[in-house]
Amino acid sequence: MREETVVYEQEESVSHGGGKHRILAELARVEQEVAFLEKELKEVENTDIVSTVCEELLSVIEKGPDPLLPLTNGPLNLGWDRWFEGPNGGEGCRCLIL
């Protein structure tokens, strides 16, 4: 009796769900997502300790100047400092990420 109920429920879900093709497409999508998540999990398991990776990334970033900020090779215009609250000398501003 239980087997007949399961078959009936499956037939009913197919008729309401839009057909076999839609169910197979959804199944393929779910299998693709599972494969993607398994790949991500393997990458996370093989990754070093996150704090070590972050420290290495931070040291690489701090070595070079910010590419979005122009470098001033001429004399400093101290008039700009009042608008941007920069330092009064030529030592520049260094922002650190904690």
From Swiss-Prot:
Positions where lipid (S-farnesyl cysteine) attaches: C95
GO function terms (MF aspect): GTP binding
User: The G protein gamma domain covers which part of the protein?
Assistant: 19-98
Q: Does the keyword Cell membrane apply?
A: yes
Upregulation details from the record are: Induced locally by Alternaria brassicicola but systemically by Fusarium oxysporum.
Instruction: Fetch the Pfam families from UniProt.
Output: G-gamma
Which compartments is it annotated to reside in?
Cell membrane; Golgi apparatus membrane; Golgi apparatus, trans-Golgi network membrane; Cytoplasm
What is the reported phenotype of gene knockout? Enhanced susceptibility to Alternaria brassicicola, Plectosphaerella cucumerina and Fusarium oxysporum associated with a disturbed expression of genes involved in cell wall metabolism (e.g. lower xylose content in cell walls). Reduced induction of the plant defensin gene PDF1.2, and decreased sensitivity to methyl jasmonate (MeJA). Hypersensitive to auxin-mediated induction of lateral roots, within the central cylinder, attenuating acropetally transported auxin signaling. Enhanced sensitivity to glucose and mannitol during seed germination. Abnormal roots architecture.
Q: Where is the stretch described as Regulates lipidation and cell membrane subcellular localization?
A: 88-94
- Pro-region residues? 96-98
Query: What tissue specificity is annotated for this entry?
Result: Mostly expressed in seedlings (especially at the hypocotyl/root junction), young cauline leaves, open flowers, and floral stems, and, to a lower extent, in roots (restricted to the stele), rosette leaves (restricted to veins), siliques, and unopened floral buds. Also present in hydathods.
Q: Which GO terms describe its cellular component?
A: cytoplasm; Golgi apparatus; Golgi membrane; heterotrimeric G-protein complex; plasma membrane
Q: Spell out which residues are annotated as carrying Cysteine methyl ester.
A: C95
| Lipid sites, type S-palmitoyl cysteine | C93
* Gene Ontology biological process terms, A to Z: acropetal auxin transport; defense response to fungus; G protein-coupled receptor signaling pathway; lateral root development; protein palmitoylation; protein prenylation; seed germination
Keyword field contains Coiled coil: yes
Keywords tagged on the record: Cell membrane, Coiled coil, Cytoplasm, Golgi apparatus, Lipoprotein, Membrane, Methylation, Palmitate, Plant defense, Prenylation, Transducer
Coiled-coil segments: 20-50
The UniProt subunit note reads as follows: G proteins are composed of 3 units, alpha, beta and gamma. Interacts with the beta subunit GB1. The dimer GB1-GG1 interacts with NDL1, NDL2 and NDL3. Binds to NUDT7.
Q: What does this protein do?
A: Guanine nucleotide-binding proteins (G proteins) are involved as a modulator or transducer in various transmembrane signaling systems. The beta and gamma chains are required for the GTPase activity, for replacement of GDP by GTP, and for G protein-effector interaction. Involved in the abscisic acid (ABA) and ethylene signaling pathways. Regulates acropetal transport of auxin (IAA) in roots and hypocotyls, and thus modulates root architecture (e.g. lateral root formation).
Its recorded name reads Guanine nucleotide-binding protein subunit gamma 1
Organism, scientific name? Arabidopsis thaliana (Mouse-ear cress)
Q: What is the lineage of its organism?
A: Eukaryota, Viridiplantae, Streptophyta, Embryophyta, Tracheophyta
